[in-house]
Amino acid sequence: MRYLTHRILLLALLAAPMCLASQSDAGRNRLIRQVRHELVMLPYYGVFDNLAYKVDGYKVTLLGQVTRPTLKSAAENVVKDIEGVESVDNQIVVLPLSPNDDRLRMALYRAIYSRPGLDRYALMAVPPIHIIVANGNVSLEGYVASEMDKNLANVTANGVSGVFSVTNNLVVEK
């Protein structure tokens, strides 16, 4: 009887870290989903902004580029209010004001989202192809359904007059 009790106790002690690990994984996954939800729901988050984040324990690091300084501070404030977040490291870059960059943004938006094959992405609430323009240099961020869409967006962006370079960071969903 004593041997059986010791064995049950030993099994319980061995199983406890696995239960705690699954609970912490569930908590981490909940935190990741909540951070994503709060960032996507920001009122002025649009196709010309790119927000990303990293969760390390209870610390959230915000990354990306935005066109408005208020969006940078709003992102930090909504993430700070999430239950379980202890600190926020805001590394979001505010893009410089430039009439030429604004003109390029509109021309790129029109070219990419009116292109047959890519026009279906324009119908989504938050279009998945984000167009980041900094001093004439373009970065395409986000997700597309196929490698062909990724290449088509790259060729289209390169064809817009006034673009100095295009960095294609689009990820193909699998």
Pin down the residues of each PLM region.
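N-terminal targeting leaders
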Residues: 2-7, 19-174
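Hydrophobic core
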Residues: 13-19
